[in-house]
């Protein structure tokens, strides 16, 4: 913290100033976030790898504190606004339409859309993340097998930081003319209760098919 001239301020004012400064992102965190945002938008990296790569690119120590996701999200939105404003809205719409296709296919498992496609920061390089809430955690996998859908099982980090089984499939977007990764994260039905708690910014962190349709209705068509 910089030692600015603070003589004559009362103790309550000093305390308020310290808290205000601590809450503000420092210049280094902002620099890392801005570098990470470019990797997220231009290369489709997830935020964690993008932050670590930004640290390396900037020549910082590997253990440098990383910016929080809110700061990275702000940087991503700013980058999109500056460099992708003409293309990103149509790409986002195409991804949400593809997400809805898979949500309808997997409707019995209460699918919810999360991540960049839900929050509106996705581009054509972004994958789609759907959370399924199942009575039987194997039932979603069985459904894919029954419908002859090729998938790749993997383990990912869930929204509580725990390990979660994911079924990754390839979804074809006619609007984008590309194949998009669609990741089906399998949760217990009981997890649905806490899945809709507001995030740090007071937003609902994921939405069901009805919510996705509402987003599409609110967007201008490409």
Regions from the language model: what does each represent?
Residues 129-135:
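Short hydrophobic/aromatic beta-strand micro-patches
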Residues 11-14:
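Leucine-biased recognition of intrinsically disordered, low-complexity hydrophobic segments
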Residues 18-24:
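A ubiquitous short alpha-helical element
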Residues 3, 17-18:
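Acidic, Ala/Val/Gly-enriched low-complexity intrinsically disordered segments
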Residues 21, 84-88, 129:
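Charged, low-complexity surface segments at secondary-structure and domain boundaries
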Residues 26-44, 49-124, 135-222:
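Catalytic core of pol beta-like nucleotidyltransferases
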């Amino acid at each position: 913290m910089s030692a600015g001239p603070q003589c004559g301020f009362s103790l309550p004012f000093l305390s308020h100033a310290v808290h205000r400064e601590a809450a503000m992102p420092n210049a280094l965190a902002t620099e890392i976030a801005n570098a990470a945002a470019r990797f997220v938008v231009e290369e489709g990296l997830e935020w964690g790898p993008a932050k670590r790569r930004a640290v390396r690119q900037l020549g910082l120590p590997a253990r440098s504190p990383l910016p929080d996701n809110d700061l990275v999200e702000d940087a991503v939105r700013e980058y999109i606004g500056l460099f992708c404003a003409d293309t990103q809205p149509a790409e986002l719409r195409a991804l949400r339409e593809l997400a809805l296709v898979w949500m309808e296919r997997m409707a019995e498992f209460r699918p919810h859309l999360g991540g960049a496609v839900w929050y509106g920061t996705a581009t054509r390089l972004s994958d789609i993340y759907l959370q399924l809430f199942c009575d039987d955690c194997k039932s979603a996998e069985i459904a894919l097998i029954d419908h002859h859908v090729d998938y790749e099982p993997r383990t990912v980090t869930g929204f509580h930081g725990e390990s979660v089984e994911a079924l990754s499939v390839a979804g074809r977007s006619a609007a984008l003319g590309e194949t998009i990764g669609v990741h089906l994260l399998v949760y217990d039905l009981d997890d649905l209760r806490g899945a809709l708690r507001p995030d740090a910014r007071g937003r609902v962190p994921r939405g069901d098919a009805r919510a996705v349709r509402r987003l599409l209705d609110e967007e201008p068509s490409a």
